[in-house]
Amino acid sequence: MREIVHIQAGQCGNQIGAKFWEVISEEHGIDSSGAYIGTSDLQLDRAEVYYNEGSGGRYVPRAVLVDLEPGVLDTIKAGPHGGLYRPDNFVAGQSGAGNNWAKGHYTEGAELVDSVLDVVRREAEGCDCLQGFQVTHSLGGGTGSGMGTLLVSKIREEFPDRMMCTYSVMPSPKVSDTVVEPYNCTLSVHQLVENADAVFCIDNEALYNICYNTLKKPEPAYPDLNKLVSGVMSGITSSLRFPGQLNSDLRKLAVNLVPFPRLHFFMIGYAPLSADGVTAYRAKTVADLTKQMFDPKNMMADCDPRNGRYLTASAYFRGKVSTKEVEEQMDAIQTKNSGQFIDWIPNAIKASVCDVAPTGETMSAAFIGNSTAIQDIFKRVGSHFSAMFKRKAFLHWYTGEGMDEMEFTEAESNMNDLVSELQQYEAATVEGEEEEDEYAEGGVVNGDQSYDEPYQAA
């Protein structure tokens, strides 16, 4: 089977990861000790994508739990689902990264990384046909960002032909946990641009807004936010774990969503989202789900897709859904909102359908969009970064761990390049391409004009 090895790093990554395992264990009918208590054969049909069947029929998650301090991992071990995981798969340091990317990437994290890779290797060897890895982490702290990206690059080195997807929690515009978030995030993005195949951008503020405005929770807490994220994670992988009419896997996902290798930062959404008690009053049709799925208020990253254009998008429907209806809706949304889609990629929306709905729903949909509006996040982080870096504020914490200022400059320019690439593709049009060809034929263009990038129409 096409297995996925899951790695969670740092406090945020472990909390999101733990919630994800709760959600999919429930879907597969696996209780907190790993025993199967489900009711349908479909639940076990492809459970081995995420679970290893141990002795005595126990299902053990293919999960590696990593942190540089033992606190969060101890909480997970002692929690109601602690018995689910393989005890050897917990790898904890003692010192913590103290929100310092350099500690996670170069000093403390580097000491621990070999023992983590041993566990990852063992999990990978236990797979028949490993499809790839998924990592949950945040980019604002020390362990998730520093050590998380170190793991991503080491795994990429060792398994160059396997997919690498990350669920990365971006720093929020208004809710900031630490002052050095812009540094940690920029250094991480610099790594993810090079070493990941797909990065799903999540941010706490957007999640707060969804909980507060859509789910009508007056005081959203982290478990509420993590539940939202795990809903999308479960939706994206549903067609790998259950039979469906239009299947998908991590590689298909990347092939359909990434038009240029560096542009693999996606925004994600989920439908249906409705407040408790209102669910019964809402009609659920494919049209409703599509409408909610493409609603900017539904995006789990704080950037408005209306400010940019979609290069590509993917929709994952679950439940008793007609494939024909799904394709009609996808076609309709592109025709109706043609201004929001790039005109030089026709049929930009890929759909997949899985027959098994999530627990407690009749149908649901997860959404992934590759939109040029994601540059808002990078611009915001970049401006905070340059404000601090200009004055060399807080730099001594990083240089003290052996980092060089050059690395900061490189990371900053890599992120700025990413923003300008996104802007360039947003402005490019089909006419621009044709114009370029005419110029080329007429031999008017200077020798140094490059044709790699789309020519921008005047």
UniProtKB/Swiss-Prot annotation:
**SMART domains for this protein:** Tubulin, Tubulin_C
Q: Where in the cell is it found?
A: Cytoplasm, Cytoskeleton
Q: How would you summarize the oligomeric state and partners of this protein?
A: Dimer of alpha and beta chains. A typical microtubule is a hollow water-filled tube with an outer diameter of 25 nm and an inner diameter of 15 nM. Alpha-beta heterodimers associate head-to-tail to form protofilaments running lengthwise along the microtubule wall with the beta-tubulin subunit facing the microtubule plus end conferring a structural polarity. Microtubules usually have 13 protofilaments but different protofilament numbers can be found in some organisms and specialized cells.
Q: Which cofactor does it need?
A: Mg(2+)
The taxonomy runs: Eukaryota, Rhodophyta, Bangiophyceae, Bangiales, Bangiaceae
**Major location (coarse):** cytoplasm
Q: Which InterPro entries match?
A: Beta-tubulin_BS (IPR013838), Beta_tubulin (IPR002453), Tub_FtsZ_C (IPR008280), Tubulin (IPR000217), Tubulin/FtsZ-like_C (IPR037103), Tubulin/FtsZ_2-layer-sand-dom (IPR018316), Tubulin/FtsZ_GTPase_sf (IPR036525), Tubulin_C (IPR023123)
What is the name of this protein? Tubulin beta chain
Lipid metabolism as a keyword? no
PANTHER family, alphabetized: TUBULIN
